[in-house]
Amino acid sequence: MTKIIGIDLGTTNSCVAIMDGSKPRVLENSEGDRTTPSIIAYTDDGETLVGQPAKRQAVTNAKNTFFAIKRLVGRKFSDQETQRDKDIMPFDILESDNGDAWLSVKGQKTAPPQISAEVLKKMKKTAEDYLGETVTEAVVTVPAYFNDAQRQATKDAGRISGLEIKRIINEPTAAAIAYGLDKGKGNSTIAVYDLGGGTFDISIIEIDDVDGEKTFEVLATNGDTHLGGEDFDNRLINYLVDEFKKEQGFDLRKDPLAMQRLKEAAEKAKVELSSAQQTDVNLPYITADATGPKHMNMKVTRAKLESLVEDLVSRSIEPLKVALQDAGLSVSDIDDVILVGGQTRMPMVQKKVADFFGKEPRKDVNPDEAVAIGAAVQGGVLSGEVKDLLLLDVTPLSLGIETMGGVMTSLISKNTTIPTKHSQVFSTAEDNQSAVTIHVLQGERKRAIDNKSLGQFNLDGIQPAPRGTSQIEVTFDIDADGILHVSAKDKNTGREQKITIKASSGLSEAEIEKMVRDAESNSETDRKFEELIQVRNQADHLIHATNKKLKEAGDKVSPEEKTSIEQALKALETAIKGEDKTDIESKANALTMVSAKLEEASQQNSSSNNAEKNDSSDVKADAVDAEFEEVKDKK
């Protein structure tokens, strides 16, 4: 059976792991790193870069280098969070035809799942390079507080990348699996505090051990899908920009190139301040005006950074209280606290969490890798590699429909264990009503308009009757991925209408199919590009070796032969500057043919050198070691 890989598709970094025998293993990418920056760039020559290569060129290609795309997945353009990002991101965020937030990629409107798919493709390739076989299935993690739209968009990204997402699991739950896998027997209740690059989650999880079988049951979850390391970076960036403006009288926000350099420097400074009390942000030639070049050189202390982000850290505490309340527990009931996500390395975050729970968080869980490890273990459960593990996750938000008076009536409450199914009977609101509109909602507010609209559908053909007579049974069915299926049935006629909430990612089936085909054709283009690079490298090596032999041969090669070799060298040097693989191979073969004499000359040189060595060794062979005795003169 093929492997089901585990992928942590993060806002800032992504990570892939597999089950290697009975142990999960995090895989290194082609750059030798265990995590990959979730950065995608589209270059002028049509190449798509992912990870470190994309990050390295971001300064000179800011408009077409995309990061933190996870914050836009499954969101509407009009969302408050989207509007906030729109003003600070160096790339363009646009409104799609159906109102979703899309991006401008080299002037083309592109859906966020299509861009996220490039990161998934990189994870897929990393696993395939290690395993030596094709990978088609994965378990992918999402923030626990992702709504239905965001989950569906993640599944769409998987399809576009060529992966069937067998299961979507929540990031804190995956981290709990990684933590609980090797722990001894006994039951425990843990809190997973997950503050990543763009999202924040808190989950209260009970781990039960019965006769060696571990059950991970999520009791409650809460969070904020727009709070993370990116927000911390932006606070520091804004501070540096404002200080620079005071000193130099120039607003760096007008210079996209400078802002990209500043983003990298701010991220680096934030990381350094987790272990140092002070750091320098030194950016020579950050910009220029009529008076000449401008340089940035500022000192930033840990205390200053903490004062800039204190309210962000405090924002993460309120969901902790709600999650504990929903789980029916108090702080004293929590046995262990697990920190996940790179932003939890900040000492201020660790202190706030420790103060809230009254205990120090565990330090034996890698915050960057735990989620991918948990996803790989769940992949092992689905493929049958891992036994004795049961995962019981929950839906993060209540689900219901709009009823008379614009009220949301919940059918499934938040923190209900999934998969689950629930039905409720409603009646018609008017006399002789022949159709009803089922408006599906997700959220905790009483007014329907204040909740997230997931979609709507009509049930027609209801028999005319006085209001309140016709009975409509509405059924909500949530699968293990947390994705919702809704049906409405007229109990009098048996007429039924069903819907799977799919439109939420903003992509129709036809659009997804087209993107899948585009991705497949791109993978063929990528393969051809790799072959071209390989042939170019071989040709470069041949040119270098031929030049060296030509120099060594000296007058052992006739002037005519030398001229033909030099012409063939020049032809190959010209060919490798082009894109025609066949032409390069042809010119390389021609050079190999005309330089055959060089090979002979090289062998002659080698033979004569060996002969000289043999002559010298013959002299040594005739020599005899003599014993001698020192005779001292008598005094």
UniProtKB/Swiss-Prot annotation:
InterPro entries: ATPase_NBD (IPR043129), Chaperone_DnaK (IPR012725), Heat_shock_70_CS (IPR018181), HSP70_C_sf (IPR029048), HSP70_peptide-bd_sf (IPR029047), Hsp_70_fam (IPR013126). Residues 601-611 have a biased composition (Low complexity). GO terms for molecular function: ATP binding; ATP-dependent protein folding chaperone; unfolded protein binding. Induction: By stress conditions e.g. heat shock. Residues 612-635 have a biased composition (Basic and acidic residues). The keyword Chaperone applies. Residues 598-635 are annotated as: Disordered. PROSITE patterns: HSP70_1 (PS00297), HSP70_2 (PS00329), HSP70_3 (PS01036). The modification Phosphothreonine is found at T199. Keywords: ATP-binding, Chaperone, Nucleotide-binding, Phosphoprotein, Stress response. Belongs to the heat shock protein 70 family. Acts as a chaperone. This is Chaperone protein DnaK.
